[in-house]
């Protein structure tokens, strides 16, 4: 087990009637036919060797670090009755949390005072809550790293390409927020946490991004590759959105079931039901169950010392199947007992040792109701066996860059030819590619308060 800590949403979970109204609003912002019962955010797929040529070489991609935090959408909306702005966080279980204390302004049109007078309304952002270490105070701080924008002030962006969505996020949301904090710091002193845009590099800069992972103020466990020109995939797996992890970081979320051994007491009569009893002094078997789909209900116990009874196991096995056993040392078992927390039925994130094949626990995932679906587990196992290394990715960089340049030059030649033939305006000069700089994942001067 490692020391990873999942951040908690600093908000109040909303009741059903409020949540339903908010889901209807999100449905409208996403241009969806009906409100989603599940998390509306897109989900990446595990990276495989074939993705290098079939995807990274075939089309333009952004690359960024894969933050090891809590994935949440952020909805900013103005109450039509009270006129007050509300900020809501949507977690992976599609729960809505009201986070008080923020003010998110619109981009000023004439004067800076508009930062205090205007409010974002109908803005939906995708990002990750993360715990960062402040280099000045050495204290842990909560921050929201934004990496996509699904709607801005009531205008849906899900059909726009990623490049356009990021431009809207930067100009229409992040800039006025950052200007507000810069010009009126006293007005922002009680904000629950800070926000930053996650830096996006071009895919051929993947080595530079990978080399920066251990220098970040938060935990990062890999890379995310996002296609530049595709729309946002609402509420499900996006086969073009790729997550790469080093072999040792590829993990699976299982449901943990403790199988407490039973011991026979020969001093008790054979027909006495007390002859066999659960031996709580012995270390149990730590069974890992994989989710088959469907609702998981009534299977979490309140006391880690109590095993599942027959009825609870029958309920569990309608949606879960025993998959493997977790390797826990005696020392680790003592650590778990010392927590004095319920263990049965919790979701645990585990990694597989490539040499021994045993599963080891990274941490509890209490932000998840269910473990990974069996199809996801299979993909992760394929990714582990396929084992794309950073060296494999590095070797592909020249081919990725060459293909990128060919597409850029081809687009320019087509663009230039079209204008030349129409004679509507003089021949355009090629747009210089932005010089790549060192990744700036958070604002360098944004640690002071």
Curated annotation (Swiss-Prot):
Q: Which family does it belong to?
A: Belongs to the eukaryotic GTase family.
Q: Where is the composition biased (Polar residues)?
A: 414-423
Which reaction is catalysed here? a 5'-end diphospho-ribonucleoside in mRNA + GTP + H(+) = a 5'-end (5'-triphosphoguanosine)-ribonucleoside in mRNA + diphosphate
Comp. bias regions, Basic and acidic residues = 424-442
Q: Positions of the region Disordered?
A: 405-449
- The protein in question is named mRNA-capping enzyme subunit alpha
Q: What is the lineage of its organism?
A: Eukaryota, Fungi, Dikarya, Ascomycota, Saccharomycotina
Keyword Signal listed: no
Give the active-site positions.
66
- Class of enzymatic activity (EC top level): transferase
Write down the EC number. Answer: 2.7.7.50
User: Any idea which UniProt keywords this protein has?
Assistant: GTP-binding, mRNA capping, mRNA processing, Nucleotide-binding, Nucleotidyltransferase, Nucleus, Transferase
Query: What's a single GO MF annotation on this record?
Result: RNA polymerase II C-terminal domain binding
């Amino acid at each position: 087990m490692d020391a990873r800590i999942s951040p908690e949403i600093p908000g109040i979970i909303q009741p059903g009637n409020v949540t339903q109204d908010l889901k209807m609003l999100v449905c409208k912002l996403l241009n969806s036919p009906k409100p989603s019962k599940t998390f509306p955010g897109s989900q990446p797929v595990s990276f495989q060797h074939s993705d290098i040529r079939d995807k990274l070489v075939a089309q333009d991609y952004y690359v960024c670090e894969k933050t090891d935090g809590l994935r949440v959408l952020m909805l900013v909306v103005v109450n039509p009755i009270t006129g007050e702005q509300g900020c809501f966080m949507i977690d992976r279980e599609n729960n809505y949390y009201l986070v008080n204390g923020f003010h998110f302004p619109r981009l000023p049109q004439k004067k800076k005072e508009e930062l205090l007078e205007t409010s974002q309304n109908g803005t939906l952002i995708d990002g990750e809550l993360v715990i960062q270490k402040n280099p000045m105070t050495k204290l842990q701080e909560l921050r929201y790293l934004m990496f996509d924008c699904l709607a801005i002030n009531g205008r849906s962006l899900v059909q726009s390409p990623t490049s356009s969505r990021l431009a809207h996020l930067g100009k229409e949301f992040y800039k006025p927020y950052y200007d507000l904090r810069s010009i009126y710091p006293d007005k922002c002193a009680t904000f629950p946490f800070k926000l930053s845009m996650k830096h996006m590099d071009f895919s051929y800069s993947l080595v530079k991004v990978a080399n920066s992972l251990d220098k970040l103020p938060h935990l990062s466990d890999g890379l995310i590759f996002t296609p530049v020109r595709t729309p946002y995939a609402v509420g499900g797996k996006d086969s073009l959105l790729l997550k790469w992890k080093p072999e040792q970081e590829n993990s699976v979320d299982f449901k943990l079931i403790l199988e407490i051994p039973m011991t026979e007491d020969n001093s008790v009569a054979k027909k006495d039901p007390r002859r066999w009893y659960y031996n709580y002094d012995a270390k149990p078997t730590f069974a890992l169950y994989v989710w088959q789909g469907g609702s998981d209900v009534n299977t979490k116990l309140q006391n880690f010392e109590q095993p599942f009874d027959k009825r609870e196991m029958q309920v569990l096995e309608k949606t879960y199947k025993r998959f493997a056993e977790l390797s826990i040392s005696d020392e680790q078992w003592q650590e778990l007992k010392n927590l004095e927390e319920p263990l049965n039925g919790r979701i645990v994130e585990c990694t597989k040792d490539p040499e021994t094949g045993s599963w080891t626990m990274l941490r509890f995932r209490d932000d998840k109701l269910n473990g990974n679906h069996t199809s996801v587990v299979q993909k992760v196992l394929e990714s582990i066996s396929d084992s794309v290394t950073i060296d494999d990715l590095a070797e592909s960089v020249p081919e990725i860059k060459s293909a990128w340049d060919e597409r850029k030059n081809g687009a320019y030649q087509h663009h230039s030819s079209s204008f030349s033939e129409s004679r509507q305006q003089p021949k355009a000069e090629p747009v210089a590619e932005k010089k790549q700089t060192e990744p700036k994942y958070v604002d360098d001067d944004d640690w002071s308060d």
